Amino acid sequence: KLYQGRRYKFPVVVVGNLNVGGSGTTPTVISLANALKTKGLRPGVVSRGYGSSAHKYPVIVDKHTKYMECGDEPLLIQRRCACPVVVDPDRPSAIKTLINDFNCNVIISDDGMQHYKMHRDVEIAVFNEHINLGSFLMLPSGPLREPITRLRDVDYIISYGKLREEIKSML
């Protein structure tokens, strides 16, 4: 695996994608968190909080948090899952907060595939058939954050719609 990072006493599940723009990671995180809750687990979610205007971290997202403080996706996750959500660019720090302050026993990272300082036990890549992946070129020439071959390292691929044959052939 490509990443380093401290292992935690509870599993960390990273949900992410290779492309810029929305591919469905947030709905996947919401579904996963709710499924884990039905199994009696106590999930917590870490997020970078894109769009946040916070100047101090961590931001603990609750029903009183304004979207400007945390970004719209962490607020949506908290409202749909009623589980702890921590926004912090330093995701390992956010994980510690969830474990120590909220007694979470499984951590989900929204859009964390490219955050290599964070250990992960399970990695899920999400694709949406309506997102244009261009010619599979990386930024700045194309829409990919990493080479498409990075998918060989993930544990699961979730596709909203049909997974393109070109992607399947590269796995």
Residue ranges with predicted function:
Residues 2-63, 163, 167:
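Walker A (P-loop) phosphate-binding motif
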